[in-house]
């Protein structure tokens, strides 16, 4: 029954990728996609010495229209390294008849393998409805990087948190047992709009790091985030000293980026960082800095400066 279900899921998928070792290098041995998804596996991406495979997921027309359902499976073989990214933000267009735009990704990461899912953000247009689910199957020595993030919309044009519905679910299963379960939901309310709740912030992001190869990146990110936030959230002091009666601002300026890190799993083998920021570029800078240490594994830095 499980085999039949897997075959049925594969048949319904709009995309399927398999990465295996070929002559000592990670290579894409299967790459299938159909409308509205397009997958590109460039032969040259990053330094050849890294031996990693790269994939670009693209939608026709640069976005997902109302009612579209994109379903993709990824299998990263034992000892392989693969990165899956995009060429620009994923645009989600206005919902028609309240139909959601959906994306589903199911990835299996082999033993001693590395899979990095490092897309650009999702940008939902006014009145859009979007739902995505990502499921990752791992082993105790698998290595996984997941960046899941979205923006308020075309906020530079004044369109800010005007979409109707956004939901993102991430599950990590360790040998088919739940290791990490996360869900983010933003929905317009009659009492408070999304814009009311998010105030001046325009970006929400989550970064998951799991596996023995990524422990040093976890430790560095946790240390630097702790230092950054201790400075940004430190109460302001006046020139008059600790006991000065000089008035402080009633509404102190909020920091342009807020981040936190939390371990998960047995012995803290995984870490999740959560970020919210005023600008997309500040999150790009955060990701570029903290994920630069992936270059030896992937042959290139994620989110390079344009």
Curated annotation (Swiss-Prot):
The regions listed as transmembrane in this protein's record are none
Q: Where in this chain does the entry annotate a coiled-coil region?
A: none
Q: Which GO terms describe its molecular function?
A: nickel cation binding
Q: Give any Pfam family that matches.
A: UreD
Q: Which UniProt keywords apply?
A: Chaperone, Nickel insertion
One Gene Ontology biological process: protein maturation
- What InterPro entries does the record tag this protein with? UreD
The record's listing under HAMAP family reads: UreD
Q: Oligomeric state and partners?
A: URED, UREF and UREG may form a complex that acts as a GTP-hydrolysis-dependent molecular chaperone, activating the urease apoprotein.
Family under the similarity heading: Belongs to the UreD family.
* Primary role: Required for the maturation and activation of urease via the functional incorporation of the urease nickel metallocenter.
Q: What is this protein called?
A: Urease accessory protein D
Could you tell me which species this protein originates from?
Oryza sativa subsp. indica
């Amino acid at each position: 029954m499980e085999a039949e279900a897997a075959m049925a899921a594969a048949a319904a998928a709009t995309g399927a990728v398999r990465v295996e070792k070929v002559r000592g290098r990670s290579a894409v041995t299967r790459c299938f996609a159909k409308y509205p998804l397009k997958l590109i596996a460039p032969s040259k991406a990053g330094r050849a010495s890294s031996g990693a495979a790269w994939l670009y997921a693209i939608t026709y027309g640069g976005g997902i229209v109302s009612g579209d359902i994109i379903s993709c499976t990824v299998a990263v073989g034992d000892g392989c390294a693969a990165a899956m990214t995009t060429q620009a933000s994923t645009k989600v267009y206005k919902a028609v008849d309240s139909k959601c735009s959906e994306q589903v990704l199911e990835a299996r990461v082999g033993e001693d393998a590395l899979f990095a899912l490092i897309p650009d953000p999702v940008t939902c247009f006014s009145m859009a409805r979007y739902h995505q689910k990502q499921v990752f199957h791992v082993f105790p020595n698998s290595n996984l990087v997941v960046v899941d993030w979205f923006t308020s919309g075309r906020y530079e044009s004044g369109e800010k948190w005007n979409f109707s519905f956004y939901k993102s679910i991430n599950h990590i299963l360790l040998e088919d047992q739940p290791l990490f379960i996360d869900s983010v939901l933003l929905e317009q309310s009659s009492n408070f709009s999304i814009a009311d709740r998010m105030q001046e912030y325009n970006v929400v992001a989550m970064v998951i790091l799991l596996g023995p190869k990524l422990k040093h990146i976890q430790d560095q990110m946790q240390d630097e985030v702790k230092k950054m936030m201790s400075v940004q959230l430190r109460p302001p002091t006046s020139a008059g000293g600790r006991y000065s009666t000089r008035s402080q601002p009633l509404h102190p300026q909020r920091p342009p980026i807020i981040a936190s890190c939390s371990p998960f799993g047995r012995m803290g083998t995984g870490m999740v960082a959560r970020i919210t920021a005023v600008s997309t570029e500040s999150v790009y800078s955060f990701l570029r800095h903290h994920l630069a240490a992936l270059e030896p594994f992937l042959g290139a830095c994620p989110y390079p400066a344009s």
